[in-house]
């Protein structure tokens, strides 16, 4: 058992080192985009499926509530949280529309719309990001593996260099925490 634990921790370290080496400029760009949008009165919309849905909620919670700094709340919505909206859209339009329909209702030009997908190929995230692009939003993909189909349609892809879903998710939450920290410092320090 100890060997397996050490193997997983080693794998985690290797992915975090790759994130640092390969993604630092992209993480900085992501934070800069979000700071500029929030300064301009825009909002964050964020989405994902499964574990990525939980990460989307976590991201929105840190932005609306606070990360580390005592400050005013900032506008962010996780499109994964309202079961009535999700099931109404899913029932009437299908699962592929659950995020697209919310983007249609909530996204304004200049908002930052973030899609999380460990595969980079979630159809419902793709459709929502495509519509967000059409509406003049800034689109960001927190992705994994090779970035999948989402990599080609977002303004900025931040693709964790791993093919292992748990390591990708760990990369995503680390990136989210870094972005939240940079947003607070960029807006309130």
From Swiss-Prot:
Pfam families: SIS_2 (PF13580). Disulfide bonds: none annotated. It is an enzyme of class 5 (isomerase). Its EC number is 5.3.1.28. Keywords: Carbohydrate metabolism, Cytoplasm, Isomerase, Metal-binding, Zinc. Zn(2+) binds at residues 58, 62, 169, 177. GO terms for molecular function: carbohydrate derivative binding; D-sedoheptulose 7-phosphate isomerase activity; zinc ion binding. Gene3D superfamilies: Glucose-6-phosphate isomerase like protein, domain 1 (3.40.50.10490). Pathway: Carbohydrate biosynthesis; D-glycero-D-manno-heptose 7-phosphate biosynthesis; D-glycero-alpha-D-manno-heptose 7-phosphate and D-glycero-beta-D-manno-heptose 7-phosphate from sedoheptulose 7-phosphate: step 1/1. It is found in: Cytoplasm. InterPro entries: GmhA/DiaA, Phosphoheptose_Isoase, SIS_dom, SIS_dom_sf, SIS_GmhA/DiaA_subfam. Residues 34-189 form the SIS domain. Its cofactor is Zn(2+). It catalyses: 2 D-sedoheptulose 7-phosphate = D-glycero-alpha-D-manno-heptose 7-phosphate + D-glycero-beta-D-manno-heptose 7-phosphate. PANTHER family: DNAA INITIATOR-ASSOCIATING PROTEIN DIAA, SEDOHEPTULOSE 7-PHOSPHATE ISOMERASE / DNAA INITIATOR-ASSOCIATING FACTOR FOR REPLICATION INITIATION. This is Phosphoheptose isomerase. The gene is gmhA.
């Amino acid at each position: 058992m100890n060997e397996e634990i050490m193997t997983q921790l080693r794998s985690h370290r290797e992915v975090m080192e790759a994130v640092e080496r390969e993604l630092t400029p992209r993480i900085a760009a992501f934070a800069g985009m979000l700071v500029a949008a929030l300064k301009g009165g825009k909002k964050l919309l964020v989405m994902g499926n499964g574990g990525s849905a939980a990460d989307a909620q976590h991201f929105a919670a840190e932005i609306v509530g606070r990360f580390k700094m005592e400050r005013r709340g900032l506008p962010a919505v996780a499109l994964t949280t309202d079961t009535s909206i999700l099931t109404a859209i899913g029932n009437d339009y299908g699962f592929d529309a659950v995020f697209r329909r919310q983007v249609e209702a909530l996204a304004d030009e200049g908002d930052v719309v973030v899609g999380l997908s460990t595969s980079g190929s979630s159809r419902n995230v793709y459709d929502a990001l495509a519509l967000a692009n059409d509406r003049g939003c800034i689109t960001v993909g927190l992705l994994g593996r090779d970035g999948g189909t989402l990599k080609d349609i977002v303004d900025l892809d931040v693709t964790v260099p791993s093919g292992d879903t748990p390591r990708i998710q760990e990369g995503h939450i680390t990136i989210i925490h870094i972005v939240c920290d940079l947003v607070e410092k960029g807006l309130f320090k």
